[in-house]
Amino acid sequence: MKYMLLIYSNPANWAALPEAEQGGLMGEYGAFTKEITESGEFVSGDPLSDTSTASTVRVRAGSTDVNDGPFIESKEHMGGYLLVECDSLERATEIAARLPEAQYDPIEVRRIMDRVEFGMEAQ
């Protein structure tokens, strides 16, 4: 099964860390990613740009409205994601708990449904 690990971050938490600790966490992240890549569980993952570069798109009555910024105001925002493939929700949550970010910010774990399960024909 595939699981999306949504990494929420608060930039103030990162900024409050000493530079050496930031570097250490980046090293941990690299080692962690290597480990789950070698185990075959890593599918993809990337950081997201700051919310100041975001746009929100809404279509109402055939009209497209594009606004700068995220949909909601919050101290935490989605900062990145990991897509993993593993046998169970339990394993996905174990992987999420090992993300260095989990020490400071929440990680949301969601199973990805396949098209048939969602009610769409497989294509």
Specify the residue positions occupied by each region the protein language model found.
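Conserved, structured core segments of small domains
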Residues: 1-123
